[in-house]
Amino acid sequence: MDVEEKRVSSGYAKPPWIFKGSALYQIHLVKAATARAFIPKEFRLVEAFGYTLGGFFLASYDDSPAGVFDELVVIAGIVWNPPTSCAWAARVLVNSDEACHHGRKEVGLPSQVARFSKNITAVPKQKRDRAFGFLDTFGLGTTLSHPENLMEVKVSEVDSAASTDICNIQIRSDETKVGNWMGPAIKMALPSFSGNTIYNSNLLKYSCHLHCRVRPVRPAVVSGALEDETEKFTEQNHTSQESLENERQLSKAVMLSKPIIALQFKCLTMQVEAPVVIYPSK
């Protein structure tokens, strides 16, 4: 049976909403058991050999309906609701109250206010790493002649006056070696499901249309403390509503899973369409 949809009204100005800036899109192999903790029972997780494709989308917007802000979208995995498969966000962290409110109310996202602390340091020159011969094709291998910069992004979730560290993301760049090449200009769509939250109980579908320069880069290194009982949280969360801390731990598990590819988006213009209500196929 095809998915039935109806339009959702929006109070966040008039859609579509336009965001401009840059982003890192990193795809991970996420344990299916971890991803299922976030997926509504009405949807089916797309998985193989116990894993699904998740990861994160780390963006810095210099122009948006909410002004300048940073965003970390933790992607639990891919879900299937015929005739469409879409990404499902486990958590969305933003350093903008307005963006957080809009994400919760209008788009059905699990948005939380967060703090993003950024630090850039120079990395000593390194010898060429033969293991990255394939990456050298794209100008990504290390070399004696071109130093790298290391940007560290520390993300902390803010709840009233308290804050909780979520993760550190280390991103290496070697702009000198690749020169001004930012990759080809492309247009792509990233459809997503959302909703089923305390702020928006509907199941929703929305699309992000991206126009940007894209190139492959080294996967960012993600670090953070993870509780030993994450698997226990996973099992409990699969059958009942868990506490905020359990959800944080599972989101960390997604971030700390194995990366398989990373794409850098520059000169990014992202158009987000108004979400529509969907009804799970029988």
Curated annotation (Swiss-Prot):
Disruption phenotype: No visible phenotype under normal growth conditions, but mutant plants lack neoxanthin.
Entries under InterPro entries matching the protein: ADC_dom_sf, NDX1-like
UniProt protein name: Protein NEOXANTHIN-DEFICIENT 1
Record's function text: Required for neoxanthin biosynthesis. Probably not involved directly in the enzymatic conversion of violaxanthin to neoxanthin. Is necessary but not sufficient for neoxanthin synthesis.
Organism lineage: Eukaryota, Viridiplantae, Streptophyta, Embryophyta, Tracheophyta
Gene Ontology BP, a term: xanthophyll biosynthetic process
Annotated gene: NDX1
The organism's place on the tree of life at top rank: Eukaryota
Transmembrane segments: none
